């Protein structure tokens, strides 16, 4: 199983890269986690809508390439209004996908969020929190929760 975090932004602070990499290296080969960064389009003055659409175009283009390599991949848009999952529910989702050999692509937008049309085209929409989270933090938080979900599936003592 392959977990792909497809995210807008390429210049993250060192703590974000270090945090993501720490959980990425803990994941087993049969549930590999990768990060695919999409460069943030140049920001115009005050037009968040066009920025979000440009980001969506870039995400969609890369997503099409991923889905060609893994036709059954499930896409999940991460957004504040998505379905809230607790750690056990996330772990069960991972287990279900792993059991059928389905890859998972998680979409993370830029500072202004995901384009509603891109979000609507995903198989599911999940929320990590009711709080508004900075998109760099989402990378670390999500990597940790994916690792924690795997530890629940395997009985690893990380989650107590």
Curated annotation (Swiss-Prot):
List GO molecular-function terms, semicolon-separated.
rRNA (pseudouridine-N3-)-methyltransferase activity
Q: What is its EC number?
A: 2.1.1.177
Record keywords, A-Z:
Cytoplasm, Methyltransferase, rRNA processing, S-adenosyl-L-methionine, Transferase
Q: Where does S-adenosyl-L-methionine bind?
A: 78, 109, 128-133
Q: Which SUPFAM superfamilies does its entry note?
A: alpha/beta knot
Which InterPro entries does the protein's record reference?
A: Alpha/beta_knot_MTases, RlmH-like, tRNA_m1G_MTases_N
- The enzyme's first-digit EC class, named in words, is transferase
Q: What is its main location?
A: cytoplasm
Reaction equations catalysed = pseudouridine(1915) in 23S rRNA + S-adenosyl-L-methionine = N(3)-methylpseudouridine(1915) in 23S rRNA + S-adenosyl-L-homocysteine + H(+)
* Entry GO CC: cytoplasm
CDD domains linked to this entry: RlmH-like
Q: List the disulfide bonds.
A: none
Question: One Pfam family name from the record?
Answer: SPOUT_MTase
Q: Where in the cell is it found?
A: Cytoplasm
Please report which protein family the annotation says this sequence is part of.
Answer: Belongs to the RNA methyltransferase RlmH family.
Its biological function? Specifically methylates the pseudouridine at position 1915 (m3Psi1915) in 23S rRNA.
NCBIfam families from the UniProt entry: PRK00103.1-4, tRNA_RlmH_YbeA
According to the record's subunit comment, the protein's assembly and interactions are: Homodimer.
Instruction: Name it.
Output: Ribosomal RNA large subunit methyltransferase H
Native source organism of the sequence? Alcanivorax borkumensis (strain ATCC 700651 / DSM 11573 / NCIMB 13689 / SK2)
